[in-house]
């Protein structure tokens, strides 16, 4: 008994003695606001396990710089870039190398530097040319980070690396050791906003305003994980399709904590809010009871008018729908639907009518709507009877503007936003080898897109095709500087597409219709490249003016 007590005390002392630094990278280009949830979630998980020296350094905070980070990591025992996106690799690469150099100055180069988040997908090519990053944490981190931290506290991290869940690295034999952390089946005890420093210009969402126009302090929460569908362009397409839910008790507790901190709005950052009808209604009721206005995401084919009315009655003021495209052949190429080929074909041809009906019902229900399209997708080639898929080809400009016209005229949305198809490692579109539906628009053809495509140093080292940076692509959501995108588009096509959408919006306003608002990169607005008048009508600068941004 005495031996066991002594061992427990020793472990407790070790846990309390180590310093863990969680780093959140800044996101250069954004159309939507939102917080890096990995920082508070992982910090909460570590706190619950007894770790008390955990720093959250979010580089999106205006009061933090990389110099502050370099100062804080000098006595750290574990450093983790948390919740990183693949698009952030240039920043991760730059900052991690500076951190390693700083540790070297103090003889502490053996301190593990880890990277977590979607940036770890297909990361072997970066790992092979980045010796200062110790390992990459693949999969959900709430439980695996505790095992990693325990190993660091015991002083056995390097010996235990092959056994630690989700840890990927180049081993002593020069092979890439690959593993993924198991799904977290219960996240009720985690405070998703633990120690979060609120950054209004990054976290508050302009879809949440008071009646007098005042911006509401916005929090993000997730109440479920997992998606039953496998849309190929989405990085959820290679994850588990089992949906895990947050308990009502935990949800209420966290909302009450947020209310005490002055929050008034909540964005539920989940894949399909209405995937389970009863759960969606209960969460709406709880949000209403706790005094929040809120919004979320769902699928066109997973909501009806009765649900919409119920959500609106319970303070829902925004629902995002990923329409992606209206052409049935595009839905088939993107694996939008589950089931047999015959079933998928039927669902694809029924989809446009569903889109129109749902948006009409949203307008009737008073639920603000968002119409989202992806440009440059592939489409299926069907046989004359439309019963078999014969192959795939790129969509055309005409295909895309037809989808826009359908959206503006048939759906009359409150918001309209675009994305150029980008290939994110971890999605079927990026990962699938061979002549898949995406090969006809993928810059690598039949080869997969890896994390290295997003890092200039890796692009140069491996000779990957280089994405040509074009300022006009910033008219679309989330297209950043180093990012492989569809070969189906070019700058003129993107510019012409956005111009066409603006013309339709302006024409609708002139005809007495409501304004549809585009989600536009704030930098473009600040530069005066895109303007909107008091009526909501748009004007855009000539394409040449986008060349140097």
What are these regions (language model features)?
Residues 1-23, 47, 51-53, 68-78, ...:
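Radical SAM enzyme core and accessory elements
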Residues 48-52, 106-107, 261, 354-369, ...:
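A structural motif corresponding to the C-terminal end of an alpha-helix
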Residues 42, 69, 91-102, 129, ...:
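A general structural detector for well-ordered alpha-helical segments in enzyme core domains, enriched
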Residues 126-147, 310-320, 386-420:
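Structural recognition of alpha->loop->beta junctions
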Residues 2-254:
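Acidic, low-complexity intrinsically disordered segments
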Residues 29-30, 123-125, 229, 277-278, ...:
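Flexible glycine/acidic-rich beta-alpha junction loops that bind and position SAM and/or redox cofactors
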Residues 52, 77, 264-266, 317, ...:
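Short acidic/polar active-site loop segments enriched in Thr and Asp
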Residues 188, 192-372, 377, 384-394:
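Radical SAM [4Fe-4S] cluster-binding motif and immediate context
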